[in-house]
Amino acid sequence: MIAKVIVDVASKSVDYKFDYIIPEQLESVIQPGVRVIVPFGPRTIQGYVMEVTAEPDAQLDVSKLKKIIEVKDIQPELTSELISLSEWMGSTHIIKRISMLEVMLPSAIKAKYKKAFKMKDEIEVPSALLQKFDKHGYYYYKDAQKNNDIQLLMKLLKDDIVEEKTILTQNITKKTKRAVRVIEGYHPDEVLAKLEKVIKQYDLYAYLSEEQHKTIFLTDIEDMGFSKSSLDGLIKKGYVEKYDAVVERDPFKDRVFEQESKQQLTEDQFKAYEAIKAKIVSQEQETFLLHGVTGSGKTEVYLQTIEDVLSQGKQAMMLVPEIALTPQMVLRFKRRFGDDVAVLHSGLSNGERYDEWQKIRDGRARVSVGARSSVFAPFKNLGLIIIDEEHESTYKQEDYPRYHAREIAQWRSEYHHCPVILGSATPCLESYARAEKGVYHLLSLPNRVNQQALPEIDIVDMREELSEGNRSMFSKDLREAIQLRLDRQEQVVLFLNRRGYASFMLCRDCGYVPQCPNCDISLTYHKTTDLLKCHYCGYQETPPNQCPNCESEHIRQVGTGTQKVEELLQQEFEDARIIRMDVDTTSKKGAHEKLLTEFEKGNGDILLGTQMIAKGLDYPNITLVGVLNADTMLNLPDFRASERTYQLLTQVAGRAGRHEKAGQVIIQTYNPDHYSILDVQKNDYLTFYRQEMEYRKLGKYPPYYYLINFTISHKEMKKVMEASQHVHKILLQHLTEKALVLGPSPAALARINNEFRFQILVKYKSEPGLLQAIQFLDDYYHEKFIKEKLALKIDIDPQMMM
């Protein structure tokens, strides 16, 4: 038998299946989807079995094939569906197969490779060095570097006293805990008869034999009052043994979830629910765009359709942007479906995430709630896929391998013949245009549940505030509104849009701004560490006391970060309890949930935060939302800037007045006449959509045209320019005259990490030769560009244009 294996080497030259002989003793356990250890050149590496055949390819010499060394899994980590998906993504998006397979799996099961020196001749190794080798005769390269032993080891390598080895290790470790069990082979009644005179041992054995189906930990026995001597006595007699029991890492093990019953649907909700249910029952693929205003009850529609899926014996997947994966959202699912829910997001440890993933693979969890990468959850019988806040750009992975969760969800829904729901209060233009064309089925929820009115939205022109002498970041209206809520003991949410509005240092005399020496961007000031940092390459420095350019002492922080706003708020409202939510305050595990719980309990009056407070908050006492700087995103060099401003402001505004108490939203802006801000005030998505579509049509942008962005980078400007011209020429040769090939031109961020960046943007409607052109460029890059250390990034359907 032959296994066709994709090896764990991220190189274009080995991006195909290698044939390996399956040893006879492994034939019964090796199947597609399992991980195996195989010899590859001089190394031993991990691979994934893609298929099993009786015979190798005709042109191969069987005598030269190597054997699989070891199989890592009892059952496959990859389903046959995920294998097919990786093949499809590899061929349509020009992604290496191994890169696609690894993004599908939890990081805990990815192989780690450690470079080491292996002792060959112990006698010849100097005694001072000998003690640094472990019991297996290895001295790891990293340790040798730390200890300054590399030079000596390289000499020993040359003299054939040591050899270089690459050691394969696993990230994954099972969590275990000491437990106790009865030894099989004895009849309990016979043992108990022998223990009648030793009462405590009798009681302990009786308990253990009755609870054989359960895992009994040592700590459980101690808690029940059984003594150590009683246990030791039973072990000595050979009736009981200690062992290491595998413990599942459940991030919610200490939580009790009250069961939640389904809510009565409104007429609009019921219509949407019925349309989706029909496709669940008939097992047909259809994409629904659920367009509902904030607070219209989209989540309840999701929950009730999932109930129908589970009643049919099928499974459901719910995707939520990482930023909106709030404890409140998880709580609703856990209350409705209990242990049937697995949660997958970056806040979990590697072990917790792997155990949640295994629950899905083994069929113990039938519902997943997770961020972007959970779209690859190993369900075998999907009945529904939901993408909440479908407009979010974070559903596109910006790093290699680049993929969009929506596209993966569509592929999987076709594979399983099940519907997809794309839900949003502010759908992306591409999705709404598809719904208008009939490609998607549009479902509308135009009203909030319980006849609750949408909040009143007021726009404050900050230019007028400035002309009236108010240089503060709080307008007169916002100040008064905050004070009113504090007097009424109601809660306030204040949103600071940090995108394009970070704090930096500025010399008031000459205008000097400290720049990153490696990137074309100003350094951001962080008050907690009192450092200037670059968010692109990680460079940091101490803020100068005087200007390096003109030696003036008038150099200070400009722009307002959340910490500065918190200080100003505390000065304005001395008695207010302020909870700040940003990257700094939520970096520790569980901090996000802890802060929100405090606010929900009423232990905070004002919640101040960045984008992470824009979604998912549904608290009855929030009656005021203030947007401190509405238009900073409008100034970004991106054709989606207006759309993202509209979406973000609408989402933030939706946090106010969701229950009995009426809500108010105050938006502070220097662009009060901009259509994206005016349409938020009117809560008029369709007017915004029509206006923005006109601009997209004029500019030949999506949804009228598709885009591909090519970014070429290198440390030398001359090489970047030459390579960019070459890429441009290749594209013109392969594409028709209808395609627009723009550039090459410097990227908006023209230098990052000391590398110059040029971009070529292709706009097209239908290009039969496009895939061939991308394939040709990818091949050309691996043949020519890599040698020159040139980087080529091919971004299909780019979400970020910087």
Predicted features and spans:
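Accessory, non-ATPase domains that flank or precede helicase/AAA+ motor cores in DNA-metabolism machines
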Residues: 1-368, 375-408, 414-424, 438-452, ...
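Short, flexible, solvent-exposed loop/turn segments with mixed acidic/basic and small polar residues
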Residues: 8, 129-131, 697-702, 747-752
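Short, intrinsically disordered low-complexity segments
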Residues: 35-37, 44, 743-768
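Generic solvent-exposed, charged/amphipathic alpha-helical segments
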Residues: 87-90, 479, 566, 570, ...
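Inter-lobe coupling/hinge segments of SF2-like helicase ATPases
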Residues: 260-266, 270, 283-721, 760, ...
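Short amphipathic alpha-helix segments
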Residues: 683-686, 721-742
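Surface-exposed amphipathic alpha-helical segments in non-transmembrane regions
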Residues: 685-687, 692-693, 731-733, 767, ...
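Short beta-strand elements
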Residues: 734-747, 786-797
